[in-house]
UniProtKB/Swiss-Prot annotation:
It comes from the Bacteria. Residues 1-125 form the ApaG domain. This is Protein ApaG. One of its GO terms (biological process) is error-free translesion synthesis. Signal peptide: none annotated. HAMAP family: ApaG. InterPro entries: ApaG_domain, ApaG_sf, Uncharacterised_ApaG. It comes from Edwardsiella ictaluri (strain 93-146). Pfam families: DUF525 (PF04379). SUPFAM superfamilies: ApaG-like.
């Protein structure tokens, strides 16, 4: 039995009002992701996949190599944090997805990114 890597994913999002143009249906959000490796071996992030859903239910898929131009190696008990952004046409929406990673033995695996909200502050209850 393979010792499955233990990776914790935490995401925080914030509305970037200064970059948004609500009158043109352009709502910009920044999100910060923290990946923590609670396992005993190094893991490396290879690819990302995002499903972005706006407030009208319109979905956009985004995928590619690494994150912010990197394929970070995360050591045991280490973490990697990055900030990126998303633009949607409505004042609220959601994001979710997964990372494809590789362990120290070359086995690839996926880590889920739990759904999180994108919302302008006046809509958050």
């Amino acid at each position: 039995m393979i010792d499955a890597p233990r990776i914790i994913v935490q995401v925080q999002s914030v509305y970037a009002g200064s970059q948004s143009l609500p009158e043109e249906a352009r709502f910009v959000f920044a999100y910060t992701v923290t990946l923590r490796n609670l396992g005993r071996f190094n893991v490396q992030l290879l690819r990302r996949y995002w499903l972005i859903t706006n407030g009208n239910g319109r979905q956009t898929e985004v995928q590619g190599e690494g994150v912010i131009g990197e394929q970070p190696l995360i050591q045991p008990n280490g973490e990697f944090q990055y900030t990126s952004g998303a633009i949607i046409e409505t004042p609220c929406g959601t994001m979710e997805g997964h990372y494809e990673m590789v362990d120290h033995q070359g086995h690839t695996f996926r880590i889920a990114i739990p759904v999180f909200r994108l919302a302008i502050p006046s809509l958050i209850n």
